[in-house]
Structure formats: structure tokens, C-alpha cells
């Protein structure tokens, strides 16, 4: 296992040199891949010389670790260990709030800039076995999706929003009466629910959506599209504005939005908590 970790680190560092990045803040998925463990032990930052780990016990989330990460990166910068004043973080795996917080921290720590449009793990991990594609399963609802969507839209109006993007797995599953997906499913398990005033669209890996699931969602007024079409879906979103929960929606998708953004807490999370 030690040899595997060494090989993976070298492959990652090769990609960082190619992209002129001095460091990379790994997502939970990336940390798992580097360590070879199924579950991340913490948040890892990789440079050309070091690997620093902020253990999950002390820093349960990236949000909690950002000040410590920023301080450590500044120390590396001051020791002239960085050839480039730019570091990377995967914008598809990091919330808008966390990216903005890290950018703000680094701006005042030597002017280090953040790049979010690059995922080195996706490049160097191509020879890994594909993650298990678990099919979506329906659950017996106590409330139909049409009713939930009506209540969600009512709450959105209270926040002066015409629609919203839901990306939290539990929220998407609850709204659509689907079984909550396994956290170990990686990017293949991600799904996005785009809600407008008169339509809703689920963007999901098509291999996971059976005909039964598609048929049920169609009766509930929910269209199913391929996961990778989410960027186009946000571009084509026709409402005046859209609600974005910065603690939920990833930075990359937030930057794809062309309409006015209303920042606020997702009403789905609150509704789900009340119903459970």
C-alpha cells in the first residue's frame, strides 16, 4: 500500500507541475484515493514536497479547517517552497461558501490565488476501477413529489426566489421520494435537482435511473436528463432569479448560473428536518 500511495502522490505532483500549481486541496474523494482508504481520514493538502493532513476528529468539515489550511499555505509560501502563487481546489466538489472563504483567506496571505476548474484526481485516477453504479430506488411516499414541489415553491416565494438548485443528496432524494444514495458512490452518485416555477429537472447518471423511476418522476412533473447536462440546464434556466444555498451548491455550478442569484438557506433541508 505504501508503494501505491507514493506512486499516486508522484502522479498527482506531475499534474500539478504541468498546470503550474504549487498545492492542491483535496476533496474527501481525492483524500480517499491518495490514501487508498474507503473513508477519508481528514482533509489533505499536497505540495511538491509535503502532504499535510487536517484530521477529521479536529476538523470535521473543510469549513472548519480553512483558517488552519490558509495559515499553513502561507508558511509554505514564506519559506519559498512555492514556485507559483497559485493553488488548486476542485470546484465541483467544494461548496461556494468554502471556495469564497479560502479565496478571502489567501488574498490576505501573500496574494495566493485559487484555481477551481481542474481536478487532477480525474486525470491520474483513470486506471482505477470505476465506482459502483448503484441504481436509484423508489420509496413508498407519505407525500407525493408534486405536493412537496408545491410546498418548496411556496417557501421560495417567501424568499423572493423563482426557483432553486438542490445538490445535497439527502434533499434531492427526499423531494423525489428516492432512496438516499450511498455516500461512497463518488461523482457517479451525484445528482442535481433544478426547480423552476413550473417545471423541475433531475440531472443524474442515466445508468442509475430505471424506467420505473423515470415513469414515476414523469407523473410528478419531473424531467430526467443526463448528469453532465447540468451546465446547459443552468444556462437555459429561464426564470428571473434563482436561490442558491452557498453551503450546499458547489462553486463550479454557481459560476455557471446566468440569472440573478438569491443567496439563502435551502427550504428543502428545513422541510426534510420537520418531516423526519
Where are these regions (language model features)?
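Terminal domain-start leader segments
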Residues: 1-276
Amino acid at each position: 500500500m505504501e508503494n501505491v500511495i507514493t506512486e499516486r502522490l508522484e502522479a498527482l505532483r506531475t499534474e500539478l507541475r504541468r498546470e503550474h500549481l504549487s498545492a492542491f486541496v483535496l476533496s474527501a474523494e481525492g483524500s480517499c484515493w491518495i490514501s487508498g482508504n474507503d473513508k477519508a481520514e481528514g482533509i489533505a493538502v499536497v505540495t511538491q514536497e509535503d502532504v499535510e493532513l487536517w484530521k477529521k476528529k479536529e476538523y470535521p468539515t473543510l469549513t472548519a479547517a480553512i483558517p488552519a489550511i490558509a495559515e499553513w499555505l502561507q508558511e509554505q509560501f514564506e519559506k519559498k517552497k512555492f514556485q507559483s502563487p497559485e493553488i488548486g481546489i476542485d470546484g465541483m466538489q467544494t461548496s461556494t461558501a468554502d471556495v469564497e472563504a479560502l479565496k478571502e483567506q489567501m488574498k490576505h496571505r501573500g496574494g495566493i490565488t485559487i484555481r477551481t476548474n481542474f481536478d487532477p484526481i480525474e486525470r491520474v485516477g483513470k486506471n482505477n476501477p470505476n465506482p459502483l453504479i448503484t441504481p436509484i430506488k423508489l420509496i413508498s411516499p407519505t407525500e407525493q413529489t408534486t405536493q412537496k414541489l408545491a410546498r418548496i415553491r411556496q417557501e421560495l416565494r417567501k424568499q423572493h426566489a423563482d426557483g432553486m438548485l438542490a445538490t445535497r443528496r439527502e434533499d434531492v432524494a427526499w423531494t423525489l421520494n428516492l432512496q438516499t444514495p450511498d455516500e461512497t458512490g463518488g461523482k457517479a452518485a451525484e445528482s442535481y435537482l433544478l426547480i423552476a416555477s413550473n417545471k423541475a429537472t433531475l440531472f443524474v447518471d442515466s445508468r442509475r435511473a430505471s424506467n420505473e423511476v423515470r415513469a414515476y418522476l414523469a407523473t410528478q412533473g419531473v424531467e430526467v436528463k443526463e448528469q453532465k447536462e447540468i451546465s446547459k440546464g443552468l444556462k437555459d434556466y429561464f426564470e428571473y432569479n434563482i436561490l442558491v444555498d452557498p453551503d450546499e451548491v458547489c462553486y463550479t455550478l454557481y459560476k455557471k448560473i446566468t440569472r440573478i442569484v438569491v443567496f439563502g438557506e435551502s427550504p428543502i433541508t428545513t422541510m426534510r428536518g420537520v418531516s423526519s
